[in-house]
Swiss-Prot record:
EC number per UniProt: 4.6.1.19
An MF annotation (GO) of this entry: RNA binding
Active site residues according to the UniProt entry: H92, E160, H164
CC annotations in GO: extracellular region; vacuolar lumen
UniProt-listed SUPFAM superfamilies: Ribonuclease Rh-like
Family statement: Belongs to the RNase T2 family.
Glycan-bearing residues: N42, N134
Keywords tagged on the record: Cytoplasm, Disulfide bond, Endonuclease, Glycoprotein, Hydrolase, Lyase, Nuclease, Signal, Vacuole
Source lineage: Eukaryota, Fungi, Dikarya, Ascomycota, Saccharomycotina
Disulfide bonds: C32-C51, C40-C99, C50-C175, C107-C167, C245-C281
The protein's name: Ribonuclease T2-like
InterPro entries according to UniProt: Ribonuclease_T2_eukaryotic, RNase_T2-like, RNase_T2-like_sf, RNase_T2_His_AS_2
Source organism of the structure: Kluyveromyces lactis (strain ATCC 8585 / CBS 2359 / DSM 70799 / NBRC 1267 / NRRL Y-1140 / WM37)
GO BP terms: RNA catabolic process
Length: 425
């Protein structure tokens, strides 16, 4: 799929001039004070949640470099259709992380969506002079630059909004009411999330940043971690950029960290250095394979694989988890399945059902009535299970005798704190 010249010109204008306004509404009834500090830098409480992003005050613009094509695909046009332009990274998403590096996910079920195509084709986002970009034009650039490694791009868009977009408080319906926005505020938030995510993605042209430093996709060449890090800093105001490699030692993810001044709608992103997360790339001999290359070590995924079976033990104490997700000391631990989620992270499942985290009290539960299967982190080296960027778990009581103890995400000074360790069967 190729963008026509007229649309490309409008997108270039969109990426450079359309977002200078404090808000996108000409007849705004509400605005944010220009004296507000950047997110995660305040010393006193900012009460107006429509003008200050908290607790998710660190905005990550994340990018993919997917290069392995579907089986049998080698034609350049088909490669672009599946993997995006051959000379560009693709968008992964816009994530509101907390100031300490943890994050929330799937924050508001009432705001969840199951469709993007029809929403962006809605009359609310097309044929108006006051729109930064028409919904149909936004959809076309997303089709080109926001690609899924599963081949189902819209499912990735829906996932990114439901997991991350619903956690951005300055896009909540009450804020749109303050600004006197006509139309459906839920739809408006979705439109704004995707247009701002695409705008920031276009501002961070990783491919050209690396190319300017002499780093280009190649089957033969390799690079050092320092070379890549120094190059990426040049494209991020001298701040450290987080990057990751795949199992073949090839560069495949870039994370740009920002703080934010005011509402997300003001788009006043301030580049900051990446929070310490640790890159999995080696110090030397990092590959950056061109799109279309299939490494000799590649093995196609088995679509019928149910996940990795194992048990979940208390990492620094006695006991294990049973089938409902509770901590127990006696008998036999339950079988858990660690299942790769389609767009990153993992699901946990027992014979009772998928495991989830209750947003109100952070309790872990595994059963068929779980409304939203949680996405967990997994540290393959240590075996630890994490949630929302942290690997801390606790219980408020010790499960003596035949007692079961509910397990909660996080830590508690008055509770029993531990890690959860997945042990493969």
């Amino acid at each position: 799929m190729l963008l026509n010249k007229g649309l490309l010109a409008s997108l270039l204008a969109y990426t450079t001039t359309a977002f200078d306004l404090q808000h996108i509404f000409y007849k705004e009834q509400y605005s944010c004070p220009i004296s507000l500090p950047a997110s995660c830098s305040n010393n006193t409480e900012i009460k107006d949640s429509c003008c200050f992003e908290f607790p998710g005050g660190i905005m990550l613009q994340t990018q993919f470099w997917d290069y392995i094509p579907p089986k049998g695909v080698s034609d350049p046009d088909e490669l672009v259709r599946h993997l995006g332009p051959l000379d560009s990274f693709t968008n992964h998403g816009l994530w509101p992380d907390n100031c300490d590096g943890t994050y929330a996910q799937f924050c508001n079920r009432e705001s969840n969506i199951d469709d993007v195509w029809h929403l962006l084709n809605d009359d609310q986002f097309n044929g108006r002079d006051d729109l930064p970009i028409n919904g149909t034009d936004l959809l076309e650039t997303m089709d080109m630059y926001w690609k899924s490694n599963t081949g189902d791009d819209e499912s990735l868009w829906v996932h990114e909004y439901n997991k991350h977009g619903t956690c951005i408080r300055t896009l909540y319906p009450d804020c749109y009411k303050k600004w006197g926005v006509a139309g459906n505020s839920k739809k408006q938030a979705v439109y704004d999330y995707f247009r701002i995510a695409m705008k920031l993605f276009h501002d961070k042209d990783t491919y050209q940043t690396l190319k300017s430093a002499g780093i280009e996709p190649s089957v033969e060449k390799s690079y050092t971690k320092l070379e890549i890090s120094n190059a990426l800093k040049e494209g991020h105001s001298g701040e450290v950029v987080h990057f990751l490699c795949d199992r073949h030692g090839s560069l495949n993810q870039i994370w740009y960290f920002h703080s934010l001044k005011g509402s997300l709608l003001g788009e006043k992103f301030v580049p900051i250095s990446a929070l310490p997360k640790g890159s999995n790339c080696p110090d030397d001999n990092i590959k950056w394979y061109p799109k279309g290359h299939v490494p000799s070590s590649y093995r196609p995924p088995n679509g019928n694989h149910p996940g990795t079976r194992g048990v979940v033990r208390i990492g620094n104490g006695k006991g294990f988890l049973i089938k409902n997700g509770h901590w127990y000391l006696k008998g036999t631990p339950a079988n858990f399945f660690l299942i790769e989620a389609p767009f990153g992270n993992y699901y946990l499942k027992t014979r009772m059902g998928y495991c989830g985290i209750d947003n109100s009290n952070k309790v872990l539960a595994c059963n068929k009535n779980v409304a939203q299967a949680a996405q967990f982190e997994y540290d393959a080296k240590k075996g630890y299970i994490g949630y929302n960027g942290a690997y801390d778990w606790y219980a408020t009581k010790y499960p003596r005798g035949n007692q079961q103890a509910p397990v909660y995400a996080g830590s508690n000074d008055d509770g029993y704190n531990f890690q959860l360790k997945f042990v493969k069967a």
